[in-house]
Amino acid sequence: DEMENCPLCPKLLERTELFGGIIREKVLLQTEPDVWMPVYILIPPAKEGRPGCVLAPHGHQGAGKYSVAGCREIPAVAEAIDRFHYDYGLYLAKLGYVALCPDARGFGERRDKAFQKEEEEAFMRGTCFHLAHMAEPLGMTVAGMNTWDLMRLIDYVEERGEWRTDDLGCVGFSGGGLQTLYLAAL
């Protein structure tokens, strides 16, 4: 019934240079004890001054952070990007913002694979339905857990200290819009 604070223990898993000088980092953050959230961080080319940040939570049916960060290696993700303009994190980085694209609980690398196959179609969906049914008897909601994780992501931005926190935004489509709305309320 309550989220437990803990050290973030950030782990840099990969750092890749994309086209146009954008850097994509994959970072793993501990949002609660033994609860880890993978995040793609898209960093624009260096300019004068520190860039602002935008949290870019994903919605449903987009394979978590992959589509928002513009990862086109998986054909179904590329199709979602083309169909729904789902790569808004990458677009923000092209505009000069640092875009932080996390996997919400039940999606991407955080989905419960016991309920799904490893096929591409299953990868596009989440398992938040199952997670919700496990959380509710404990007095918790998936939306609340995801909002907590976004708050911890802001903690990481502040702890890292490389980017402006007075120019911090959040934008998402569908379920990512819901996460944005709840985060703004807190």
Map each language-model feature to its residues.
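Cap/lid segment of the alpha/beta-hydrolase catalytic domain
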Residues: 49, 56-151
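An acidic- and aromatic-residue-enriched active-site/binding cleft used to recognize and process polar
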Residues: 32, 44, 59-60, 104-107, ...
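Short amphipathic alpha-helices and their capping/turn segments at secondary-structure boundaries
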Residues: 39-47, 89-92, 182-185
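Short, hydrophobic/aromatic alpha-helical segments in well-folded domains
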Residues: 25, 42, 87-88, 153, ...
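N-terminal cap/lid segment of alpha/beta-hydrolase-fold proteins
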Residues: 2-55
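Beta-sheet entry/capping signal
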Residues: 38, 52-54, 96-99, 167-169
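Primarily recognizes the serine-hydrolase "nucleophile elbow" in alpha/beta-hydrolase
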Residues: 145, 152-186
